[in-house]
């Protein structure tokens, strides 16, 4: 506040990722639990983050300034994707960051100062849109393809490596490759299992997009505020372990975006998910029912072929299924693919 009083530029942005003081004010209040320590001295300050945001806006801060890169201090590593399910903030505005925190007060403040609530994050390159499971599988196939590393493994580790890839092959292929024989002599089956896996991956890559949506190019709109406020990432990684948001803020923030801002409840993110998909991944039955009342489509299919019920049924490994939400969505008309990855 003293810097603003002395004429500091409220729009000065980080040369590393484009973060402005306005974005930082929201982010510091709701910084996720990451591997990096987060300064806490601000909690003893006289002015709160909303006071600072209003002062920045009054001094001329651009409410629609966008992030140019995802900030390094909002990452995890070793999860199969860089953020462990946390949203990729490239292209995000302060308004979208507030929506991600389910912070209605901050969203209202920003909108009052002219923020555009319809600006989305930017879609990454297509190769970077894979799920945690897809990335894990890719690394497993690459490991199997490395002959030298494979030969250094113990017999049991070799068997596990081959059987893991074998387990993802079509049943028609597995019939001709008995599991007991693979476990006995994994080195003899390594190459043939690898070839089948690569062939299957090639076939999968040529399949039409199950969502029926046109592709989103790199740099196109990815995640909108409605997705951020409904739980984007909870069904795509382990965001639930790190994400911080306003207490009991899910429904109020979505209601604000739908009823006051006018967002379409069926708007899709770059992966083809709707707000119902994201609410389902968290088991938020109250929000699901609200979205349905507002015209939400429970039959929507994502680009990964997941129904809304699938998102509540262990959509990635180590994310537990939520039977009550699966049952609710089935009763509302969603199909259930019975593909619980946590249960496998």
Task: Show which residues each predicted segment covers.
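Start-of-repeat signature of ankyrin repeats
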Residues: 17-18, 70, 91, 124, ...
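Ankyrin repeat A-helix N-terminal signature
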Residues: 24-49, 75-90, 97-103, 130-146, ...
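Leucine-rich solenoid repeat scaffolds
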Residues: 298-342
């Amino acid at each position: 506040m003293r810097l603003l009083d002395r004429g500091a530029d409220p729009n000065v942005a980080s040369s590393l990722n484009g973060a402005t003081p306005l974005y930082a004010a929201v982010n510091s209040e709701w910084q996720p639990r990451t591997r990096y320590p987060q300064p806490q001295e601000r909690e003893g300050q006289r002015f709160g983050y909303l006071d600072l945001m209003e002062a920045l806006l009054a001094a001329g801060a651009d409410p629609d300034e966008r992030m140019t890169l995802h900030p390094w201090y909002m990452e995890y590593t070793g999860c199969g994707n860089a953020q462990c399910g946390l949203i990729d903030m490239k292209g995000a505005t302060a308004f979208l960051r507030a929506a991600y925190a389910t912070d209605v007060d901050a969203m209202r403040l920003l909108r009052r100062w002219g923020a555009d609530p319809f600006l989305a994050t930017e879609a990454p390159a297509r190769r970077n849109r894979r799920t945690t499971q897809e990335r894990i599988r890719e690394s497993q196939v690459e490991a199997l393809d490395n002959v030298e590393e494979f030969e250094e493994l113990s017999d049991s580790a070799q068997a596990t490596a081959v059987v893991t890839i074998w387990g993802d092959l079509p049943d028609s292929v597995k019939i001709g490759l008995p599991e007991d024989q693979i476990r006995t002599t994994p080195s003899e089956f390594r190459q043939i299992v690898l070839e089948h896996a690569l062939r299957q991956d090639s076939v999968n890559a040529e399949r039409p997009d199950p969502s029926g949506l046109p592709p989103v190019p790199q740099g196109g709109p990815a995640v909108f505020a409605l997705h951020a406020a409904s739980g984007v990432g909870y069904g795509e990684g382990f965001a639930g372990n790190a994400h911080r948001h306003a207490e009991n803020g899910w429904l109020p923030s979505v209601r604000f975006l739908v009823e006051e801002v006018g967002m379409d409840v069926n708007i899709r993110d770059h992966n083809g998910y709707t707000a119902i998909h994201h609410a389902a991944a968290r088991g938020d039955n109250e929000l699901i029912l609200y979205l349905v009342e507002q015209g939400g489509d429970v039959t929507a299919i994502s680009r990964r072929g997941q129904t809304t019920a699938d998102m509540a049924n262990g959509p990635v490994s180590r994310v537990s299924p939520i039977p009550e939400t699966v049952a609710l969505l089935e009763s509302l008309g969603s199909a259930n693919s019975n593909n619980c990855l946590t249960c496998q």
